[in-house]
């Protein structure tokens, strides 16, 4: 049977991959957004694993809310990215600081 340690190991691996994705690739906004989603997925796996281990459904319900917010965050981030690409022709992180209102 898969124990709590296995879920925590997978979650820690996803968190480390997400952190490395942000620090190693500082130019592409899409990779940064995907790395943030990986880190949120790691948190969700932790919530579900501990919720199942303790026999409480609160963590699983909270995970549904986090997934909903993460989906909205990804949609808004990609919409801003598409608009920025249409206006500037690039998606480099260094060029984002020219977005002044």
From Swiss-Prot:
GO CC field: NADH dehydrogenase complex; plasma membrane
Ranges annotated as spanning the membrane: 4-24, 30-50, 65-85
A GO biological process held by the record: ATP synthesis coupled electron transport
Enzymatic class: translocase
Cleaved signal peptide residues: none
UniProt superkingdom: Bacteria
Subcellular location: Cell inner membrane
Keywords annotated in UniProt: Cell inner membrane, Cell membrane, Membrane, NAD, Quinone, Translocase, Transmembrane, Transmembrane helix, Transport, Ubiquinone
Physiological role: NDH-1 shuttles electrons from NADH, via FMN and iron-sulfur (Fe-S) centers, to quinones in the respiratory chain. The immediate electron acceptor for the enzyme in this species is believed to be ubiquinone. Couples the redox reaction to proton translocation (for every two electrons transferred, four hydrogen ions are translocated across the cytoplasmic membrane), and thus conserves the redox energy in a proton gradient.
PANTHER family, alphabetized: NADH DEHYDROGENASE SUBUNIT 4L-RELATED, NADH-UBIQUINONE OXIDOREDUCTASE SUBUNIT ND4L
Protein name from the UniProt record: NADH-quinone oxidoreductase subunit K
Annotated gene: nuoK
């Amino acid at each position: 049977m898969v124990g709590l340690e296995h879920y925590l190991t997978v979650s820690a691996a996803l968190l480390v991959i997400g952190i490395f994705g942000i620090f190693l690739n500082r130019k592409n906004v899409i990779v940064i957004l995907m790395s943030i989603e990986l880190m949120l997925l790691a948190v969700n796996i932790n919530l579900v694993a501990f919720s199942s281990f303790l026999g409480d459904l609160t963590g699983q319900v909270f995970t549904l809310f986090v997934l909903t917010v993460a989906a909205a965050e990804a949609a808004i981030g990609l919409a801003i990215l598409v608009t920025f690409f249409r206006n500037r022709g690039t998606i480099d992180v260094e060029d984002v600081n020219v977005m002044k209102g």
